[in-house]
Amino acid sequence: TRTRINGIEAQASTGATDSSGGVNRGRGFDFNVFASELFNNITVRKTSSAEVEEGSLGATVDLRTSRPFDKMGFQGALSGQYGYNDLSEDWSPRFAGLISNTWADDQLGALFSIAYSERESLEEGFSSVRWGPASADGGFQNGSVLPSPSTTYHPRIPRYGSLEHGQERLGATLSLQARPGNGPTLFTLDMLYSKLDSTRSENFLQAWSLSRGADQGGKPQVDIVDFAIDPDTGEMTYARLDDMDIRSEQRFDVLETEFKQMTFAVEHEFSDRLRFNGLIGRAESSFGNPVQVSAIIDRQNVDGYSYDFRENRNLPAINWGFDVTDPAQWSIVGPTGAQPRSELRSSANFQDNVYTTGEANFAFELSERLTLKAGVSRKEYESSSRAFARLANGAPALPAGVTMADVTDLRTGFGKNLDLPAGAATSWIRPDLEALQTVWDYRCNCDTGVAGGDFRLVGLNGNPSTYGNWREVTETVTGGFVQADWNLEIMGLPVRGNVGVRQVKTEVEALGYSNVGGVATPVTGQNEYEDTLPSLNVAIEPMEDLIVRFGAAKVMSRPPVTSLVPVFALSAVNASSNTASLGNVELEPYRAKTYDLSVEYY
C-alpha cells in the first residue's frame, strides 16, 4: 500500500519498540504522525489505473487536506476532547480548529487549520521473545534428561514488560486558492506541517540464560530440575531450572518526527473539451531518536526459577527464585565480573526521507461518453540514515560507597487487568536512569577514564556496529501514461471504466559503508530498470443499487530501501547464531499481475 498526500507520494517515519520493528528505515508510512482532523477526505484506490503512479502491489491511499473553495464564504470549526485512560491513570487533551474565507466574489480563498493532542498510555504483558530449541546455544548442562533436545522448544527470554508511552503532536495546514476572474484557471497552494514528539520508557523483568551460550554464562550452565513437554507441539510448557541469570532493564527513548510538505497545483480548462492539471511538490520527513539508553542489572545463578504455561498459554506463572523487590538481591556486574555483565547501552538514530515530484496531465473529451487522458511525471526519492552508539555496552562498577539502593527504584503496579496467576510479581527493582546519570555521567558523550566508562557515541569514525545504518539511497523515476475513460450503456446497462498503460523508468543510486579492518569504507552502486504497466477497470450496473467491478493490471513495487545498499555484513563470528547479509542495488522490483472482482450492493 502506498500513501499520497495532496497528490504526491510522501513518507512519514517514526520509531517503535525493537519487537515492533524499531526505527522505520524503509518505505512504510507511519500514520500516527498526523492528526486525522487535518484531512478533509481520504480515497482508497483498490485497483490500479494508468493515471495513478506506480509503486504498490495493492491499494493506493490518497489523503487531502481542506481547501477554502471546498465551501465558499467564511467558515469556522472548533473541536475538543478530554479523555481519561484508566490504565495509565492520565488525562489526554485533544483539540482542533479551522478557519476559512473567500474574497473578491470567491476568486480568492485562504484556509488555516490546526490540531494538537497529548497522550499517555501504558502497555503491559508477557513476552517469550520467540521460542527456540533446547539444543541451541550449546544446550542445557544436563540436556540429556530431555527426550529430544533438538525438537523440544522453550521461551528464549521469558519476561514481564511494562511500557509507558508519552506523545505530544502538533499539526497545521495552510491552503491558498485563486481563480482569477472566476475564469478557467485554478491555482492551489497547500502546505502541511506536523510535529510528533514522543517518549517511551520500557521496563523488563526477564530470564536471560535461555538465549545465550557459554561465553555469556548462558544455557550450558543451567540445570533442568523438572519439566513438562506438550507431546503435540514439542513445547516445554513447564520448567524448573537452577543456575539461571535474571535481569532487570529500564530503557528510555526520545523520538522526534517533523514532517513538512508543500504542493502547488494548476488546473486549466482550454475549452469545454480540453483540460490540464499539473503540480509540483516536495515532502520532507525528518526522524530523530537522539536518546536511546538502556540500563541492565543482574542477579546471577538463581536456583528455583520456574515458568509454567500449562494453565495459561499466553500468561505463564513465573517463580523468579528470589525476592525481586529487594535491591540487595541485585548487583551491577562490572567489566571484570563474571558473565553476563551488566550493561549501559546508549545510541542515537536518525532517518530522513524526501520526495520531490512534478507532473503534467491532459484530458480531452472526444464525446460525452469517451475521454482520452495523457500525462508525464518525474519523482525523486531520497532516503538517508545515520546511527551512533557506544563502542562497548558494558557498565562500570559502582564507585565505593554507592549501593544498589542508591541507583535503583521499585517499579510497582504491574499487571492491571491482566489477570495474573496467583503469586505473580507485580513489583520489581529496576535501574534508575537518573540516579545512574548522577553516578556515571553517561550523557557526557565522553570517556570518563574509568573501566567501562567510555560513553562516547561513535558512528562512521570508528564504530563498526553502526556502519550498516549509515546509508543513502536516491531513486529517480520518470514516467508517462495514456488512458481512455468511458461511460456507456450497453444493452441498457450502465458500463463505465478505463483502460490504459503506464511506462516508467527507475534509476537508483545507493551508498553504504563496509567494515574494512575497522574502517568505514564507502561502497556505491547504480541500477536502472523499466516497466510497462497496462491496466483495465470495468464497472457494470446490472440492476439498481448493484455494481459488479472487475480490474486487471500489471503492477510493481520497488525493493526495500535497506536491501539496496551494496554492503556485506556478518554477525560476530563467535555468536550463537551467525548470520550474513548482502545488499544488492541491482534488485529488481516486485512485479505481479493482479485480477480483482467484486460485487457491491447498496
Region locations from a protein language model:
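Outer/extracellular conduits and scaffolds centered on Gram-negative outer-membrane beta-barrels
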Residues: 404, 410-412, 416, 420, ...
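Extended hydrophobic/aromatic segments used for targeting, binding, or gating
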Residues: 224-226, 294-314, 506-538
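Outer-membrane beta-barrel transmembrane strands
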Residues: 59-65, 81-82, 91-102, 157-202, ...
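Outer-membrane beta-barrel domain signature, especially the mid-to-C-terminal portions
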Residues: 202, 304-306, 512, 520-527, ...
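Flexible glycine-rich, low-complexity coil/linker segments exposed to the extracellular/periplasmic environment
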Residues: 137-155, 219-244, 305-341, 397-469
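Extracytoplasmic beta-strand/coil segments of soluble accessory domains associated
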Residues: 1-17, 46
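Outer-membrane beta-barrel translocator/receptor signature
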Residues: 12, 21-29, 37-44, 51-144, ...
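Outer-membrane beta-barrel and related beta-rich outer-membrane complex signature
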Residues: 15-17, 119-131, 188-223, 243-247, ...
